[in-house]
Structures are given as structure tokens and as C-alpha cells.
Amino acid sequence: MRASTILYFIAIIFSSFPLLAQEEEDIPFFLIEKHPYYVQTDTITGETKEIPFKIFLDQWVIKNYRYPQEAVEKKIEGRVIVQLRIDKKGILSIKEIIGRNPLLEEEACRIFDGFPQFSPALQRGKPVNILYNYPIVFRLAN
């Protein structure tokens, strides 16, 4: 009797691990029901508007993009893929950077310094962690 009770509790404990793992799983951006968005408040009127994540992200990168001077001098060009993670609280972090040059990778990382908090992505009405791959191309003008 005692052995069967212990086995029962062990089975319950191990069966709950997949549920815990699912809660913290990062979901690809394209599978999300409601994407994250930034709430922008007009300082004069107080009106708010929702800016979709991808639009805000593009604007942020354009505004903060700088070609590293050393890369200019060495004529280094390339593409860097930044894997972004937005957690359940809407906070962005960099999960991975894939590129061929450390100077360009470092600049790609710097671009996201100070990135504001978003309203999180929702899946079935609940906040979820998501992943989004963002390419940044470093190309010198001819």
C-alpha cells in the first residue's frame, strides 16, 4: 500500500513538469494571436495610441542605427540576426545574436539599449513570452 502511494505521488509530480515548461515556453512571433504593442501618449493632449510592435521596432532601429567607425575604416559589411525575446511583462531582451563580425554584432546589440516596455503578446487571452528574429544589414554607401 505504501509503495503504491509513493509511486502515485511520483507520477503526479513528473506529469506536472510539462505543464510548467509550457508556461515559460517562448512562442514564435508568427503564432501569436495578439502581438505586443507600444502605448504612446501625446504629451499635450494626453491621448494614447497603440503602435504595433513591428512598426515601432523598425522606427527604433532607424532612429538608433549607427555604423561603427572601426567597421567603416575597415570596410566591413554584413548582416546580423538579432533574436529578440519579449517576456510576459512586455520587457525586451536579446536572446541571441548571429553575425560574422563582432563589431557589427556589438552595434546590433547596442541599438536595443533603452528599448521601452511594451504591452505583452497574448495567447488565449494570457500574456506569453515570444521570440522575434530581426535582421540588421550593415552596408556601406558606395
Question: Residue ranges of each PLM-predicted region?
Answer:
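N-terminal secretory signal peptides that target proteins for export/translocation
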Residues: 1-2
